[in-house]
């Protein structure tokens, strides 16, 4: 429930240099992934022809729907998503709203909560990014650790938009282990429906079972969305990135404690090096590799169906 097909997530400081760096190929993709080489091209998913082939691979593996959460600050292109959907037969559900503070348009700094809310309501009900293509989910709404005042205003606007449209909200929390809980507590304090809140990137943020279960007890949906990132190296903070086996072990702990219906999984592909054609695993990885692993590790077909079909279907239904 969290991918990017067309986006540009180039860090602002790197973008300001104007340097694109090396072309990505099979010989340097791992050096780029481990930070030994820098290539701004890593952060650009802007090749519609490549995207079509990558999504076709997912469809061939049995996938039917992609939740595409490229939002304000990441250069969304709704028209390209529509073209890719038509070319592949895949359903693409588009997000809306704004990413973290540093990526946002400077004009956002003076905007009000009501202004952000009206924008997101319009993106869901009428069309987003100067098109008539409507968003089907709000997000990924970005926040950093610590949370900035601008990000809080966007989040408050997203809550109003949720109330008006019935769409679910996906939040990108900061990388501090306390921030997912901070976001969940904020939603609780606002009286928001917790089963309509998806907290992304939990598999790079929370590694303690007690902390994970406390978060789940709020009723939010917990998203492990970095499946396929198997290396322990993580450039953004000093953590040991879990592999897919550890992800499945933590999800089993959630299930054992009654939280099966609060789990969604994905890849969050936002780097070119994670595409098959640049040496990566692609959008088909969960279908071809993770689900067979789940079966080998004792996940029932009913559990897999809940995670892969029923919970996403519930979240993508407006209420």
List PLM regions with ranges.
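Acidic (Asp/Glu)-rich catalytic clusters
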Residues: 56-60, 81-89, 124-133, 160-163, ...
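Short acidic/histidine-rich active-site segments
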Residues: 170-172, 224-226, 258-280
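Divalent metal-coordination and catalytic microenvironments
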Residues: 2, 66, 98, 162, ...
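Active-site gating/metal-coordination segments in enzymes
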Residues: 65, 83-86, 91-165, 221, ...
């Amino acid at each position: 429930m969290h991918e990017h097909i067309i986006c540009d997530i180039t860090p602002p400081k790197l973008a300001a240099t104007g340097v694109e760096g090396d072309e990505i190929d099979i010989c340097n993709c791992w050096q780029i992934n481990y930070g030994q080489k820098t290539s701004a091209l890593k952060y650009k998913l802007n090749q519609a022809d490549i995207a079509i082939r990558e999504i076709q691979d997912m469809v061939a593996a049995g996938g039917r729907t992609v939740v595409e959460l490229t939002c304000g600050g990441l250069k969304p292109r709704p028209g390209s998503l529509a073209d890719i959907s038509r070319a592949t037969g895949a359903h693409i559900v588009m997000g809306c709203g704004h990413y973290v503070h540093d990526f946002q348009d400077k004009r956002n700094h003076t905007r009000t909560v009501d202004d952000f809310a009206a924008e997101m309501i319009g993106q869901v009900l009428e069309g987003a990014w100067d098109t008539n293509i409507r968003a089907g989910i709000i997000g990924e709404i970005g926040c950093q650790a610590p949370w900035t005042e601008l990000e809080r205003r966007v989040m408050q606007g997203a809550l109003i938009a949720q109330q008006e449209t019935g769409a679910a909200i996906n939040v990108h929390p900061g990388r501090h282990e306390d921030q997912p809980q901070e976001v969940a507590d904020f939603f609780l304090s606002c009286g928001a429906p917790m089963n309509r809140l998806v907290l992304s990137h939990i598999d790079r943020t929370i590694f303690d079972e007690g902390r994970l279960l406390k978060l789940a007890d709020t009723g939010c949906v917990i998203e492990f969305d970095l499946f396929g990132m198997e290396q322990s190296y993580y450039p953004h903070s000093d953590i040991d990135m879990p592999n897919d086996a550890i992800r499945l072990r933590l999800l089993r702990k959630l299930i054992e404690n009654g939280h099966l219906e609060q789990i969604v999984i994905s890849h969050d592909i936002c780097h070119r090096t994670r595409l098959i054609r640049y040496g990566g695993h692609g959008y088909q990885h969960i279908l071809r590799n993770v689900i067979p692993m789940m079966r080998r590790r004792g996940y029932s077909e009913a559990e897999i169906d809940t995670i892969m079909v029923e919970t996403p279907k519930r979240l993508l239904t407006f209420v």
